[in-house]
Swiss-Prot record:
GO terms for molecular function: glutaminase activity; imidazoleglycerol-phosphate synthase activity; lyase activity. It is found in: Cytoplasm. HAMAP family: HisH (MF_00278). This is Imidazole glycerol phosphate synthase subunit HisH 1. It comes from Methanococcus maripaludis (strain DSM 14266 / JCM 13030 / NBRC 101832 / S2 / LL). GO terms for cellular component: cytoplasm. IGPS catalyzes the conversion of PRFAR and glutamine to IGP, AICAR and glutamate. The HisH subunit provides the glutamine amidotransferase activity that produces the ammonia necessary to HisF for the synthesis of IGP and AICAR.
Length: 203
């Protein structure tokens, strides 16, 4: 079962529809027991870093989604998308007083240039590491982005893909069984759907 984690951040139906092309065993949930029993997890989302972390940190029964996610990322394939990627870091300039999940060391910063913000539209992804999500996808293919902040991991070996928008920034991270994309694979045509298929097929 693939669990899409619902923390009131929107954009859940689009990733659910994309996953349904490859499996029907999907649930959208915030229930801790369901999340803990899942074979794979997806953390999507659009919105504000601080508001989202407050939702994730609220207790649901005996524990918070924050605690549940940090347990699960050690065991099963995990995919963070857009804001879901940024939440995996330790903190963000968008809401400096609110800690992130801390799964990956580093922070989230606002674009430091005069290019139009948000970075919105199609852009190429440079594959800097060979990871399972890239299988069947050529280098420098186009994916769809909508964001004003980007990740800045202190662990540079987790950077698997980069994109240039005024300067080069990380757009795909991979740490063990944790994967994260700044772009929206579910909105990125055939290449994005191939990436989702690759995630579904992970063991």
């Amino acid at each position: 079962m693939i669990a899409i984690i619902d923390y009131n951040a929107g954009n859940l139906r689009s990733i659910e529809k994309a996953l349904e092309l490859y499996t029907k065993n999907i649930v959208v949930t915030s229930d801790p027991e369901t999340i803990l029993s899942a074979d794979k997890l997806v953390l999507p989302g659009v919105g504000n870093f601080g508001d989202s972390m407050k939702n994730i940190s609220q207790k649901t029964g005996d524990c918070s989604l924050n605690e549940i996610i940090n347990k699960c990322v050690q065991k099963v394939p995990f995919l963070g998308i857009c804001l879901g990627m940024q939440l995996l870091l330790e903190k963000s300039e968008e809401c400096p007083e609110t800690p992130g999940l801390g799964v990956i060391k580093g922070d989230v910063i606002k674009f430091k240039h005069s290019e139009k913000i948000p970075h919105m539209g199609w852009n190429t992804v440079n594959q800097v590491q060979d990871i399972p999500l890239f299988e069947g996808i050529a280098n420098n293919e186009y994916f769809y982005f909508v964001h004003s902040y980007h990740v800045n991991p202190s662990e540079k070996d987790v950077i698997s893909g980069t994109t240039n928008y005024g300067y080069e920034f990380p757009c795909i991270l991979n740490k063990k069984n944790v994967y994260a994309t700044q772009f929206h694979p579910e909105k990125s045509g055939k290449n994005g759907l191939k990436m989702i298929e690759n995630f579904v097929e992970l063991i």
